[in-house]
Amino acid sequence: MKTAEAQAPAVDAVIFKKEKRKRLLIKLIQQKYLYLMILPGCIYFLLFKYVPMWGIVIAFQDYQPFLGILGSEWVGLKHFIRLFTEPTFFLLLKNTLVLFALNLAIFFPVPILLALLLNEVRIALFKKFVQTLIYIPHFMSWVIVVSLSFVLLTVDGGLINELIVFFGGEKINFLLNEEWFRPLYILQVIWREAGWSTIIYLAAITAVDPQLYEAAKMDGAGRLRQMWHITLPAIKSVIVVLLILKIGDTLELGFEHVYLLLNATNREVAEIFDTYVYTAGLKQGQFSYSTAVGVFKAAVGLILVMLANRLAKKFGEEGIY
């Protein structure tokens, strides 16, 4: 009798597990089309994001292409020590952090402001037109964006310089003046990317209950107060998530954009880790060293995301995990 009583909980546990598996299987069958929809994305991340992580090990090797990963000599932290003792390390760090600060302080609030303003537009056709207009640049490559800037800003025949001369000023060499590199960089980022983030915020705003605005109007609240007390709090969680992800890109500003603007006259303010990795890795063939720089950037980004996420949760926000 005692043996049967002792075995009862174990039998119940087995039955519970079987029922749980059965429910899971039924749920998978019911949602099979949803899983099929996300399958291509999962395959993409597996092949192009996770499998290449195997290459991280060459950051700890003196990698030789002919010997391969398994045949190359292990050197430990040699390449990381070289990076931190490199004379240009602090220059690269400074330039990267300055551009990131500009992104965070100037670019990040722009889509929020645009979304708030577009939400107040009552003419639907005009609203859609503006949304399309600011979103189109996102589909242009940085090559096209920078090329358009060159056409507008060139000293001889550039529209901007022609206007400056027309109003009595002197021509400015925007492209070869290091003082203009950062303003040009951030203006191009705003023009190309602001529309994408604006769409995200607008989607979040659509979830706000219209009755809240009606109640605010009855209480005498104007549009500015409605924005401040209703719309902004409603999209606060989205802002926090995008801010955390943005902080994770502190050292990841994007190679292509900066490299297209980089030249001999502005290198002191334009050289960042991304362009440095390209020069060391592809131009000079220092594969292990350039990988070590990439690992350093990824580690910093991961730490900052974790810290930002913890800070967000400390202040009562959801965070990203």
From Swiss-Prot:
GO biological process terms held by the UniProt record: transmembrane transport
Matches recorded under CDD domains: TM_PBP2 (cd06261)
Keyword Transport: yes
Membrane topology: Multi-pass membrane protein
Listed GO CC annotations: plasma membrane
Superkingdom to which the source organism belongs: Bacteria
Keywords: Cell membrane, Membrane, Sugar transport, Transmembrane, Transmembrane helix, Transport
Localization: Cell membrane
Domain ABC transmembrane type-1: 1-144
UniProt keyword annotation of Methyltransferase present: no
TM region positions: 21-41, 63-83, 123-143
Induction, per UniProt: Up-regulated by growth on type I rhamnogalacturonan.
Gene3D superfamilies, alphabetized: MetI-like
Chief localization: membrane
UniProt record similarity statement: Belongs to the binding-protein-dependent transport system permease family.
Protein purpose: Involved in pectin degradation. Part of the ABC transporter complex YtcQP-YteP involved in the uptake of polygalacturonan and rhamnogalacturonan type I. Responsible for the translocation of the substrate across the membrane.
Assembly mode: The complex is probably composed of two ATP-binding proteins (MsmX), two transmembrane proteins (YtcP and YteP) and a solute-binding protein (YtcQ).
Protein name according to UniProt: Polygalacturonan/rhamnogalacturonan transport system permease protein YteP
Classification of source organism: Bacteria, Bacillati, Bacillota, Bacilli, Bacillales
